[in-house]
UniProtKB/Swiss-Prot annotation:
Keyword Protein biosynthesis: no
Side Extracellular, residues: 132-142, 231-240
Tissue: Predominantly expressed the ventricular tissue (at protein level).
Function: Essential for maintaining proper cardiac intercalated disk (ICD) structure and function as well as cardiac conduction velocity in the heart. Its association with SCN1B is required for stabilizing the perinexus in the ICD and for localization of GJA1 and SCN5A to the ICD. May regulate the function of the gap junction protein GJA1 and may contribute to the stability and proper localization of GJA1 to cardiac intercalated disk thereby regulating gap junction communication. May also play a role in the regulation of mitochondrial respiration and mitochondrial DNA copy number maintenance.
Protein name per UniProt: Transmembrane protein 65
A GO biological process held by the record: cardiac ventricle development
Amino acid sequence: MSRLLPLLRSRTARSLRPGPAAAAAPRPPSWCCCGRGLLALAPPGGLPGGPRRLGTHPKKEPMEALNTAQGARDFIYSLHSTERSCLLKELHRFESIAIAQEKLEAPPPTPGQLRYVFIHNAIPFIGFGFLDNAIMIVAGTHIEMSIGIILGISTMAAAALGNLVSDLAGLGLAGYVEALASRLGLSIPDLTPKQVDMWQTRLSTHLGKAVGVTIGCILGMFPLIFFGGGEEDEKLETKS
């Protein structure tokens, strides 16, 4: 950190990249995010008189996407060491194939390949949608019939709490759903790097995810079969 502080003092709060007007512009205090809080590095003359902005993104500036250096860095830091190693190997392999086929004209994906891409992306999201909707319905119903009667919360509030439980469960079950989908024997579609970047492939990918989530959410409504109207009538009688 002691080596980075002189460099951070020479950068503005908006960017760490040198610009053409960086030398002529005055140097406002920089902000250093140290994990536990924000540390203001004020210039020798004292603190500025203007308002201070907390955070690394100024107002109305969008968050960094994955196609930027900051977004890619944030994504890499969120991975485990084994995941980073596997990602690095696959990136090297993918780039070597892309360089070898750079001058070759890649044909568009065939309808069979597009169908395979569609199915490959739809199956995991069927599991995601199924678990999300089923857990939300079961948790929301039990919350409404237990805590809802005691505290007198509405049905929408119970559904919101059920959605909270479903989201928390999804954080831990996402890896198991992906592992189960990989055991079905669906390997990665055999496409060249140029074919992966074509609009037909991306369209099939997004359609597969959308259809998979839709089917999964519809299948996840099956707990409604076991919840009849008697429980609702009992709740209304208890409230009255």
